[in-house]
């Protein structure tokens, strides 16, 4: 487009920047930034979000990524539009396409969920999501400190990603504390319960499995239900437990059965194999039921595998 003398709008640059950020090519992302500057365009929060994403996805991983994340969050505080792309934005709104979806941000799937995300927190959404992906607890806590100093309030997405980060780093207590502080004062979406339960199962420690079980029981008490994706993810995670009574996996299976929800084949297969590894009679009702569900799924998918 540049070769043909077409002047790109700010929104087009930002789309390109975020698309390249997904590949981790920081050199190409910086090239877009230089082109924007040359065109008289300033960087807005979506540009800084793209820069954070680019460094998060960079391969091989860079040692300065945590510092870069903090740097971009700080720089974003002075963002402004030099050219406001009002017409494009209006068109996107009419088409019901949010900025989060347009720029493929981590919050895209929640953009139309009332009260799930506070849109003024975009840069923190992306930065804390990056911390969770990278498993960088130190960077997370630096961001949360910056967040608190700006007198912002957490939204569900911020808490969900912070909980995920803590759990990936093995800090179950901090994850539980953050979850409980948020849930005690605000409506808590099912996704947050699922994030805590699934993450607590990492490593299958006694403490983690206890937290996962308690979290699922709270979901049931509050009349939350698992959808097929949530159920599949949780069952797949719980089915990896090699010791213990398989209590959590059984509980998740029962939650799904109550709603007549059949999880995806890999989760059912993993659950079945976990049951078979335990000393369960071949005519046990649970084992028979799971085997039947597995057979039915296999018929839909193709040639039968050997599950015995």
Where are these regions (language model features)?
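A basic, Ser/Thr-enriched alpha-helical scaffold prevalent
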Residues: 1-308
């Amino acid at each position: 487009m540049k070769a043909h003398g077409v002047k790109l709008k700010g929104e087009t640059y930002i789309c390109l920047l975020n698309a390249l950020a997904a590949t981790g090519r920081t050199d190409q992302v910086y090239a877009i930034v230089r082109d924007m500057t040359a065109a008289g365009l300033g960087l807005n929060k979506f540009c800084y979000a793209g820069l954070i994403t680019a460094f998060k996805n960079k391969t091989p991983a860079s040692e300065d990524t945590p510092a870069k994340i903090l740097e971009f969050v700080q720089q974003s505080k002075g963002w402004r539009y030099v050219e406001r792309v009002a017409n494009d934005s209006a068109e996107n709104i009419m088409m019901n396409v949010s900025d989060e979806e347009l720029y493929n941000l981590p919050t895209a799937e929640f953009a139309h969920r009332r009260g799930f995300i506070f849109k003024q927190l975009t840069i923190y959404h992306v930065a804390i999501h990056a911390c969770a992906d990278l498993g960088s607890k130190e960077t997370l806590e630096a961001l949360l400190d910056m967040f608190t100093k700006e007198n912002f309030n957490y939204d569900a997405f911020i808490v969900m990603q912070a909980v995920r980060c803590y759990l990936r780093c093995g800090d179950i207590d901090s994850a539980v504390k953050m979850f409980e502080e948020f849930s005690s004062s605000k409506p808590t979406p099912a996704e947050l319960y699922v994030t805590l339960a699934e993450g607590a199962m990492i490593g299958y420690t006694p403490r983690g499995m206890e937290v996962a079980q308690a979290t699922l029981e709270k979901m049931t008490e509050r009349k939350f239900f698992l959808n097929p994706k949530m159920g599949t993810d949780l069952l797949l995670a719980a089915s990896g437990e090699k010791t213990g009574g398989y209590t959590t996996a059984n509980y998740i299976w029962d939650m799904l059965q109550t709603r007549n929800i059949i999880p995806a084949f890999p989760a059912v297969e993993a659950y079945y194999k976990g049951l078979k590894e335990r000393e369960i009679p071949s005519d046990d009702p649970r084992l028979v039921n799971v085997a039947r569900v597995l057979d039915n799924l296999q018929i839909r998918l193709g040639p039968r595998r050997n599950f015995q």
